[in-house]
Amino acid sequence: MLGWPPDGPTLRLDYRRFSYAGKFVMSNTGKAVVREADEATDREYDDAVLAAVAFNDDRTDPSALWLRYVTVRDDRRGEGLGPRLCRRVVAEATDRGYERTRIAVNNPFAYEALHRAGFGFTGETTGLAELVLERPVDRPAERDPGAYRAGLDRFRARDLSAAETEFLERKRDVDPPRE
């Protein structure tokens, strides 16, 4: 944990290797990271970081924490680092008095990864057409196959990359992944 929002932590990620790299320079969100062991960094970017998440309070619900951005270094995607890091932030949110954690995702890969972190689709979207997922901080969300598939169907209705289309086809009629 680099720090919570009041601490103003910042992080310089290489934009060529991380999605949303510019969002981690901002000091108005908390940050947590997974780092390579024994990797020292004294360069322009924090090259030891493998995954990062930025988060802050929900402005309308003091009992909720929003995960704002989750990113995994391009060569380490698919290893479960993002879900593991999100579970760690959720665990620490429990100690800070939060009751639930939310995130809005914009692609089916993130949707799947956050289900692996114990989140479930709420049926809601943001104004940016992101799907809102939520979980209590003290346990995973209830596994709801119908809600999970409904979220996947919302992605299917979009203009997708070939990789996203193939991924969604493999997920047709399957149950949500387990944490």
Each model region followed by its residue ranges:
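Secretory targeting signatures
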Residues: 1-5, 85
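Conserved beta-hairpin
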Residues: 12-52
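A conserved beta-strand-loop-helix scaffold within acyl/acetyltransferase catalytic domains
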Residues: 42-64, 70
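A conserved beta-turn-beta hairpin within the catalytic core of GNAT-like acetyltransferases
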Residues: 57-68, 77, 96-99, 127-129
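Conserved acetyl-CoA-binding loop-helix of GNAT-fold acetyltransferases
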Residues: 72, 78-91, 116
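Conserved GNAT acetyl-CoA-binding A-motif
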Residues: 93-106
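Conserved active-site alpha-helix within GNAT-family acetyltransferase domains
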Residues: 106-129
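C-terminal "cap" of GNAT-fold acetyltransferases
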Residues: 127-179
